[in-house]
Amino acid sequence: MSAKGQMLQDPFLNILRKEHVPVSIYLVNGIKLQGQIESFDQYVVLLKNTVTQMVYKHAISTVVPARPVQVPHEHPAPAAGTAEI
């Protein structure tokens, strides 16, 4: 996975984990899983509901939080001669 992918993915999953936000995880085969993210690493997400499931990231299509979350991220500095919107 690219470094940029990790820069987006890790803060998003981490805020969901820290704030115990309920999530729906859609797999590439269309199955919907629900629960809270207990932990994650480069390859898997541990999803806790009545049981804890290990879900491989390559099988995940979409992660949908039950409520809006604010993901901390750094904004790159605007290029010289451009205005920030």
Swiss-Prot record:
HAMAP family, per database record: Hfq
Family statement: Belongs to the Hfq family.
Assembly, per entry: Homohexamer.
Domain of life: Bacteria
Classification lineage: Bacteria, Pseudomonadati, Pseudomonadota, Betaproteobacteria, Neisseriales
Molecular function via GO: RNA binding
UniProt-recorded name of the protein: RNA-binding protein Hfq
Gene Ontology BP term (one): regulation of translation, ncRNA-mediated
A cellular component term, taken from the record's GO annotations: cytosol
Gene name of this polypeptide: hfq
